[in-house]
Design a protein with these regions (language model features):
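Acidic/aromatic-lined carbohydrate-recognition and catalytic surfaces
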Residues: 81-273, 284, 291, 295-343
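Loop/helix patches that line or flank the sugar-binding groove of alpha-linked glycan CAZymes
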Residues: 395-398, 403, 407-549, 557, ...
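C-terminal beta-strand-rich structural cap/linker in extracellular carbohydrate-active enzymes
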Residues: 578-596
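Bacterial N-terminal signal peptides that target proteins for export
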Residues: 2-14
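Bacterial lipoprotein signal-peptidase II cleavage site
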Residues: 26-35
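Beta-strand-rich binding/interaction modules
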Residues: 547-572
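Conserved alpha/beta catalytic core and glycan-binding cleft of carbohydrate-active enzymes
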Residues: 202-203, 208-209, 213-238, 314-315, ...
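C-terminal motif of bacterial Sec signal peptides marking the signal peptidase cleavage site
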Residues: 22-24
Length: 596
């Protein structure tokens, strides 16, 4: 690190320290005792989503004068050396390497009091996701939003579309959607829509008309000139696995998921013309791309056919908008989904690291970090052999998976939860965060439980709170709501904010060529060096539960032997900080260090 940067860091630290000592502001003043609130959140602090009675029992109020005096004294008593992360400017690049926030509109924020989240509710909370001001630290810092389906649909989840050109009335109108896009553009947020092309709803006019045609056909042979929509689906008179009987006829139709989701015939040129029009419609409106649902199901058990269709779709979308972003869901192991990169698609969700059985969770729970480090470093070869321009899409959970709060138990649970988040967010590519994961929301079992209302407050009657899916089980949240966590510097929420901020400060994290430093790493310390456009950043993950030391003699970054001056960010789960002295690195349990 050159002298100019070191001087800027020193000046920033001095200024920040003076500001903290002279003011009574700052996160976590009331939690200056160093206790991680998550240690108690699962006991006395654990609350039900409908326990409104508990929420009225707040602490007594004091006068403004008393509060100010106590706050000033508290700030003086708990003033700590400022974190350099707060003083380093962001380097957010307008490309397709982003941090996406997955939003289930139904459960996010209700603007009209009907218990269902809507687009106006999302618009009102955009500043929570990203306020568009790089100088603030009050937002999450995500610069992308993945909208789960918002098209009209008869189901709460809306993965069975009845109109690809409109917005579900429960969510709002096309004008609301256009307002959302404009508000996101002002904040530098790229919006991608869920595009469901494997199937439609059985209530879609295409299927309704095709069904009516077959019911009236009798024993005659179908003619697509009489009913073009017959060719939009797979119909047969022979019963087969994955096919459902069409009531009132002797015909069957393909419906691999369930009878209400008839599979589309993606070989139909007429249907492909419809798909091209649909993509153009939304891209012209300002959508930044699409999340492609169930891409491995397009052609059942045929990777070559799936890749061929994805190639056509990618070319179609890119011809309309060159910088559009496409990410596909191919729920397979790494050797399976990586083959889909041959289509030229930008990204595929990296299922190998996600979920309770994924590599991140296993590593955090005690497996050797060696496999994590070696696998991270090998991804470029694994994916690059199919598409040298690939962009990985790491995620930790999504709407189909149990939420990560349930993965960990015991006294280290909250620390492990945080560590896992960092290991996901510090991977290459476009990282994805499922709404509420930044709060440690619970949700497992049936799908409805995984899509519970965003936990803005303990008070279920608070403005904006959603009711959630009708068939969701009643269960208690494990950790505090946003109301509490936003006031606690050691909360899961604040940890996520800091991790995303570090990611946004160091573009090498998402874009760099990865080298696993096996000679220095060991079972509990994983060291990765990432190089992008001639600049290096070193990431050190310590997955041990207790504080640990590592000899880093010989470790360099940007051509210099590592010293404390090279620290440009760290993630700890409590008050103990990472430090370097005489080539010995000391890191608290479940911590991450960033060097540059």
């Amino acid at each position: 690190m050159d002298m100019a940067i070191r001087m800027k860091k020193a000046a920033a630290l001095i200024l920040a320290y003076c500001m903290i000592c002279l003011t009574a502001c700052g996160n976590g003043g009331a939690q200056g005792n160093g206790t991680d609130p998550a240690d108690t959140a699962g006991t006395a602090g654990e609350v039900g989503m409908d326990s409104a009675a508990e929420n009225t029992a707040e602490t007594g109020e004091s006068t403004d004068t008393d509060s100010a005096a106590e706050g000033a004294q508290e700030a003086s008593d708990t003033a700590q050396e400022p974190d350099i992360t707060d003083m380093i400017p962001l380097q957010v690049i307008d490309d397709n390497y982003r941090t996406y926030y997955e939003v289930f509109v139904y459960s996010f924020y209700d603007s009209d009091g009907d218990g269902i989240g809507d687009l106006q509710g999302l618009i009102s909370q955009l500043d929570y996701i990203n306020d568009g001001d790089d100088t603030t630290d009050t937002d999450l810092g995500c610069n992308g939003i993945w909208l789960m389906p918002v098209n009209p649909s008869p189901t709460y989840h809306k993965y069975d579309v009845t109109d690809y050109y409109d917005i579900d009335a429960a969510y709002g109108t096309l004008e609301d959607f256009k307002e959302l896009l404009a508000a996101c553009e002002e904040r530098g947020i790229k919006v991608i829509m869920d595009l469901v092309l494997n199937h439609s709803s059985s209530e879609h006019p295409w299927f309704v008309e095709a069904s009516s045609y077959l019911k009236a056909l009798g024993d005659d042979e179908p003619n697509i000139e009489d009913c073009p929509y017959f060719d939009y689906y797979h119909f047969t008179k022979e019963p087969a696995s994955g096919y459902e009987a069409l009531p009132g006829t002797d015909w069957y139709y393909e419906a691999r998921f369930w009878s209400g989701m008839p599979d589309l015939n993606l070989d139909s040129q007429a249907l492909r013309g419809e798909i091209e029009d649909i993509c153009k419609y939304w891209l012209d409106m300002g959508v930044g791309g699409f999340r492609l649902d169930a891409v491995k199901e397009y052609y059942t058990e045929s990777i070559p056919d799936n890749v061929a269709f994805l190639s056509w779709l990618t070319d179609t979308v890119k011809a309309e908008k060159e910088d559009a972003y496409l990410v596909g869901e191919a729920w397979l192991d790494i050797n399976g989904f990586s083959q889909y990169y041959a289509s030229g698609i930008d990204s595929l969700f990296n299922f190998s690291f996600a979920g309770a059985e994924g590599l991140i969770c296993k590593t955090v729970k005690g497996s050797s970090t060696v496999r994590y480090g070696e696998t991270i470093a090998s991804l470029d070869e694994t994916f690059g052999q199919y598409n040298e321009n690939y962009i990985d899409a790491p995620f930790y959970t999504n709407h189909d998976m149990a939420r990560s709060a349930g993965y960990y138990v015991g006294e280290d649970a909250v620390s492990q939860l945080k560590m896992a988040a960092a290991m996901n967010l510090f991977m290459n590519g476009s990282a994805f965060v499922y709404y509420g994961e930044e709060l440690g929301m619970k949700g497992s079992g049936k799908d409805e439980n995984k899509r519970a209302p965003m936990y803005w407050s303990k008070n279920a009657d608070m403005e904006g709170m959603c009711d959630g899916p009708a068939d969701m089980d009643a269960f208690e949240m494990k950790y505090e709501s946003l109301e509490e966590q936003s006031k606690d510097q050691y909360s899961i929420y604040c940890y996520y904010k800091k991790a995303i901020r570090i990611r946004n400060q160091n573009p090498e994290i998402a874009r760099g060529k990865v080298e696993y430093l096996s000679g220095i790493s060991n079972e509990r310390f994983c060291i990765l060096k990432k190089t992008w456009e001639g600049s290096e950043v070193v990431l050190i993950f310590h997955t041990g539960a207790e504080s640990g030391e590592l000899d880093i003699a010989g470790l360099t970054v940007n051509g210099e032997t590592v010293t404390p001056d090279h620290i440009c960010g760290s993630l700890e789960t409590g008050e103990e900080k990472c430090s370097i002295a005489d080539s010995v690195l000391t890191m608290p349990g479940y911590s991450v260090l960033v060097l540059k």
